[in-house]
């Protein structure tokens, strides 16, 4: 990236995060991660906003105390943290004065619809999902404050940036067609090269588009919808299933804190959907026997089948104490898949 990336970070912090002079702002990202640099430091400072930096471990009560003590008005955090706050219970929120909160945003991975509904219930306002990548250097598609939110959508491209859904040859696709989320190059914060890997850098571009590696679709109103990483999409019984939609359906069940979904090779169906699920603490305490666990698995499979297409439910479910994640909170499906298939795990940092 070049130094002019701060232009995009400044503008999007103003437009999307709605930062104002009088705000007290908290971006919960690690300062060493790209979001920490772009929006905990550069985006907030360039807008003249006071920012909280907290280096401690995640603790729901501690987080609410910080929001209360420092009168935080704009809060930018990760879906994983939101789900953990949901799991901690709503009663904890009532112990603190959070009336100064006016704008909530999320970053790092897709935002499950259930998390948006929860924030409306407990904070009186939705979390606004934002989409971008290390390679893009700044927010590219988002739900900004002036927009009506379609729960589950990534939102729309930020002003000055052109986004589209394209096929593998870089040709634009129609409304509600699954394809690659792509951007027209040359926005200020776009990466300029990959160090010592020029061919890798070139591989990101096709027919005048930057190909993000994420799959999605665009509806008739211009809202973008995330399906999954291109290499995460599951092909089962001749159908394509994005892991995010299955994970979101599972998380909507009251017994589930979070879920990670992979495709597992199957001789009959090509792949089957396997889900790794973290259960609510109260459910774990009441579930001691194998028959009880099997009953919950069956209940979850039927729940997903009821809310999604008949082929999109998990045929295997495994309960976990926690899911492998990056420092930024993204669920590392590739590590879960490597463990499941007995393959080398590789780098566990990103």
Task: Identify what each model region corresponds to.
Residues 68, 75, 187, 192-193, ...:
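AMP-binding/adenylate-forming catalytic core of the ANL superfamily
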Residues 100, 124, 160, 255-258, ...:
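Glycine-centered tight turns that cap/initiate beta-strands
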Residues 157-160, 171-203, 239-241, 343-344:
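Conserved ATP/PPi-binding loop(s) of AMP-dependent carboxylate-activating enzymes
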Residues 14, 20-22, 46-49, 72-77, ...:
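Gly/Ser/Thr-rich phosphate-binding loop
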Residues 7-27, 31-74, 88:
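Conserved AMP-binding/adenylation subdomain of ANL enzymes
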Residues 27-28, 53-54, 105-107, 166-168, ...:
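Thr-Gly-centered strand-to-loop micro-motif
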Residues 339-350:
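Acidic/polar alpha-helix N-cap and adjacent early helical turns
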Residues 108, 132, 155, 214, ...:
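Active-site glycine-centered loops adjacent to acidic/histidine catalytic or metal-binding residues
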């Amino acid at each position: 990236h070049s130094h002019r990336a701060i232009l995009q970070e400044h503008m999007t912090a103003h437009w999307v995060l709605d930062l104002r002079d009088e705000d007290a702002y908290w971006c919960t990202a690690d300062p060493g991660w790209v979001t920490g640099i772009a929006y905990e430091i550069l985006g907030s400072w360039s807008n003249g906003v006071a920012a909280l930096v907290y280096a401690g471990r995640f603790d729901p009560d501690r987080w609410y105390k910080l929001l209360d003590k420092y009168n935080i008005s704009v809060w930018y955090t990760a879906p994983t943290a939101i789900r953990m706050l949901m799991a901690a219970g709503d009663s904890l929120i009532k112990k603190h004065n959070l009336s100064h909160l006016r704008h909530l945003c999320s970053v790092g991975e897709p935002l499950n619809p259930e998390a948006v509904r929860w924030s409306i219930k407990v904070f009186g306002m939705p979390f606004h999902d934002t989409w971008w990548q290390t390679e893009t250097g700044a927010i590219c598609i988002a739900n900004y404050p002036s927009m009506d939110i379609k729960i589950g959508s990534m939102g729309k491209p930020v002003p000055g940036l052109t986004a589209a859904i394209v096929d593998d040859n870089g040709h634009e696709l129609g409304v509600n067609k699954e394809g690659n989320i792509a951007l027209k190059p040359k926005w200020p914060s776009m990466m300029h090269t990959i160090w010592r890997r020029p061919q890798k850098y070139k591989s990101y571009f096709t027919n005048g588009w930057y190909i993000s590696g994420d799959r999605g679709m665009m509806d008739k109103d211009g809202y973008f919808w995330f399906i999954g990483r291109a290499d995460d999409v599951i092909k089962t019984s001749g159908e394509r299933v994005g892991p995010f939609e299955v994970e979101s359906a599972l998380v909507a069940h009251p017994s589930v804190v979070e879920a990670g979904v992979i495709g597992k090779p199957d001789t009959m169906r090509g792949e089957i959907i396997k889900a790794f699920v973290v259960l609510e603490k109260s459910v774990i305490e009441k579930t001691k026997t194998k028959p009880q666990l099997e009953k919950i698995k069956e209940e979850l499979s039927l729940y997903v089948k009821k809310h999604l297409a008949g082929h999109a439910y998990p045929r295997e479910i495994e309960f976990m104490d926690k899911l492998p994640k990056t420092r930024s909170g993204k669920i590392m499906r590739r590590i879960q898949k490597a463990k499941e298939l007995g393959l080398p795990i590789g780098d566990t940092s990103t």
